Amino acid sequence: MKAVILTKPTESTEVKIAEYPTPAVKPGWVLVRIKSFGMNHSEQILRKSEISAPYIQKPIIPGIECVGEIADASDTAFTAGQKVIAFMGGMGREFNGSYAEYALLPAHHVFAVDTNLSWDRLAAIPETYFTAWGSLFECLSLTSNDHLLVRGGTCALGYAAIQIAKALGCKVTATTHRESKMQLLTDCGADTALLDNDSLKGQVLGITKALELVGIKTLKDTLSCMEKGGIVCNTGNLGGVYT
């Protein structure tokens, strides 16, 4: 099969597609024929630096999510040809991921779906919307009465969070560092779009929940914007600051 294979830190211009053995099935794992996959910031981090970490399998095929069909169900309850999605749980780090024609995946990380969405549209959903859902409901316990701040709203995760929050009935304020992208936030459903200069204190009122996607760079400022008893979920690191 064809696959992207990493063994060391690699620039984007150095990424190459190579021949790699199609994995053999084993008990509890299924072979998925990859039809499409989303690309994530975490894969960029892996390619640039994390590949050097001792916990990363090497060589590794990156890719933390995919959509496709069951090619071989092994001893599981899946059936050949079944449409599935899979994401995270060690994909592209502990075992080979989705940047390939086939992926051997633990059956408990694979989910059957019944949809008429095209493969490329379906591939935009798994990791992004799963992360947004977990951040909003598992971490923030979001309700329709909340005023949600999405800090760094013009990334894929930000768009997903805005859409979910508005579907719930929340008031949503979202930010971007680029004036040219402010209209995208309101088109996505945000009630208010703000140009972010890394200091929102005094510009926003009534924020009860916040999804911090810029990261440590703006986290302290986000905390200063919260109403008493508010909750902040720091899910992203678009700002590139780690300490």
Model-flagged regions — what are they?
Residues 83, 147, 171, 230-231:
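Short glycine-centered segments of the SAM/dcSAM-binding site in methyltransferase folds
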Residues 150, 166-221:
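Adenosine-nucleotide cofactor-binding segment
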Residues 129-130, 152-159, 215:
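Glycine-rich NAD(P) Rossmann-fold beta1-alpha1 loop
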Residues 87-152:
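NAD(P)H dinucleotide-binding glycine-rich loop of Rossmann-like/cofactor-binding domains
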